Amino acid sequence: MMCGAPSAVQPATAETQDIADQVRSQLEEKENKKFPVFKAVSFKSQVVAGTNYFIKVHVGDEDFVHLRVFKSLPHENKPLTLSDYQTNKAKHDELSYF
């Protein structure tokens, strides 16, 4: 993977689910709702001064959200940040940079 270029879409891993779980409360607070399901399906990553993760998450029924989560460099010791998100997504919607 080149620095700055997003990776190809990959199936979600246990690490991806952990990242999504760590920002779930941030999303639920911003959307003012609780999601009955929160399962990471796929992701892309982008190496910057840290790592951006673009994660497609199933949130119940036919509903999906796309998350952009920033993970700082290890020596900075900062929590994960929900940088941006997109709601009203479907399973077939492409996971792209936003």
UniProtKB/Swiss-Prot annotation:
Gene Ontology molecular function, alphabetical: cysteine-type endopeptidase inhibitor activity
Motif Secondary area of contact per UniProt: ranges: 46-50
Main location: cytoplasm
An example Gene Ontology CC term for this record: nucleus
Keywords, comma-separated and alphabetical: Acetylation, Cytoplasm, Nucleus, Protease inhibitor, Thiol protease inhibitor
Modified residues (N-acetylmethionine): 1
Repressor listed as a keyword: no
Job description of the protein: This is an intracellular thiol proteinase inhibitor. Tightly binding reversible inhibitor of cathepsins L, H and B.
Quaternary state and interactors: Able to form dimers stabilized by noncovalent forces.
Protein family membership: Belongs to the cystatin family.
Name the record gives this protein: Cystatin-B
Organism for this UniProt entry: Macaca fuscata fuscata (Japanese macaque)
